[in-house]
Regions:
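Extended intrinsically disordered, low-complexity coil regions enriched in Ser, Thr, Gly, Ala
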Residues: 55-63, 180-186
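Short, small-residue-biased leader/transition segments that mark boundaries at the very start
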Residues: 1-4
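Fold-core signature of tandem repeat domains
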Residues: 7-14, 21, 27, 34, ...
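Short, charged/polar, low-complexity loop and linker segments
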Residues: 19-22, 146-152, 178
Length: 257
C-alpha cells in the first residue's frame, strides 16, 4: 500500500510540474544545463511511474525521483537571470543620448514587462537602432538646415515648396525635443528623413531665378524703348549678376521709372 501511495504521489508530482514548470519564466530563461537536469528528472520519474505492478519501483526510488524533481526545479535560475538582464539593459538604455523622454518611457515599460531573455535581447537591439536613427535625424538637421536656407535654391523657391520644407524640419525638431517629443518608431523617423530629402529636392529657386532673369532681360530689350542700347546692356548685366528675384524686380522697376 505504501508503495502504491508513493507511486501516486510521484504521478501527482509529475502532473503538477511537467506542464507548468516548462512554461514558466523561471524555466524558459534558466541556464541550459539546469533545464536539462529538470527534464531528465521528469523523464526518469515518468519512466518509473509507468512500471507495472509486477515490477514496481521501491519506495526509495519513488522518494528519490520526487526529490530530484523538486531539487532540479528549485535550482532553475530563469527569474534571476531575467532580472539581472533587465537591470543591465535598463542601465544601457538610460545612457542612450538621442532618444526623447516618451521613447525612453515606452522602451523602459516594455523591458520591465518582458518575460524572456530573447524578448529582452530583441528590445535592446531595436532600441539601439532607434537611437541610431534619432541621431541620424539630429545630424541631418545640423548639416542641412543652414546651408539649404542660405542657398539660392531655397531663397528663390516657390512659397509652398519652402513651406513644405520648413514643415518637415519643424516636425523633425518636435520629435527631437527631449521633453515633449512624441514616441515615434524607426519607420516614422525614416519616413520623415525621406520627407526632408524630398522637400529639399523639390525646391526650385535656381530654376525660378534663371527663368526670371531671362524674362526680365526680354522685357528690358522689348518693352523699355525709352532706354538706349548702352542703358539696356547695363541693366541686363545687373539682372544677370543678381541672385535674388526680389532684387531683379527692383532693378526692372527702377529702369521703368
Amino acid at each position: 500500500y505504501t508503495t502504491l501511495f508513493r507511486s501516486k504521489d510521484l504521478r501527482d508530482t509529475l502532473e503538477s510540474n511537467s506542464t507548468s514548470v516548462p512554461n514558466s519564466v523561471n524555466y524558459i530563461n534558466a541556464d541550459k544545463n539546469l533545464q536539462i537536469e529538470f527534464d531528465e528528472a521528469l523523464q526518469q520519474a515518468s519512466a518509473t511511474s509507468s512500471k507495472t505492478s509486477e515490477n514496481p519501483a521501491t519506495i526509495e526510488e519513488v522518494l528519490g525521483l520526487s526529490q530530484a524533481i523538486y531539487d532540479t526545479k528549485n535550482a532553475l535560475n530563469g527569474e534571476q537571470r531575467l532580472a539581472t538582464e533587465k537591470s543591465k539593459d535598463l542601465k544601457l538604455i538610460k545612457g542612450l543620448k538621442d532618444l526623447n523622454k516618451a521613447q525612453l518611457e515606452d522602451v523602459t515599460n516594455k523591458v520591465n514587462a518582458a518575460n524572456t531573455l530573447t524578448e529582452l535581447s530583441q528590445l535592446t537591439q531595436s532600441t539601439l537602432k532607434l537611437n541610431d536613427k534619432m541621431k541620424l535625424l539630429r545630424d541631418k538637421l545640423k548639416t542641412l538646415v543652414n546651408p539649404v536656407k542660405a542657398s539660392l535654391n531655397y531663397r528663390n523657391a516657390d512659397y509652398n515648396l519652402k513651406r513644405q520644407f520648413n514643415k518637415a524640419l519643424k516636425e523633425a525638431k518636435g520629435i527631437l525635443n527631449k521633453n515633449s517629443g512624441p514616441n515615434v518608431n524607426i519607420n516614422d523617423i525614416q519616413h520623415l528623413l525621406t520627407q526632408i530629402d524630398n522637400a529639399k529636392d523639390q525646391l526650385n529657386g535656381e530654376q525660378r531665378l534663371k527663368e526670371h532673369q531671362q524674362k526680365s532681360e526680354v522685357y528690358v530689350i522689348k518693352e523699355l524703348d525709352i532706354l538706349n542700347n548702352a542703358q539696356k546692356a547695363a541693366i541686363i548685366n545687373q539682372i544677370r549678376a543678381s541672385k535674388d528675384i526680389k532684387i531683379i524686380n527692383q532693378i526692372v522697376d527702377n529702369a521703368i521709372e
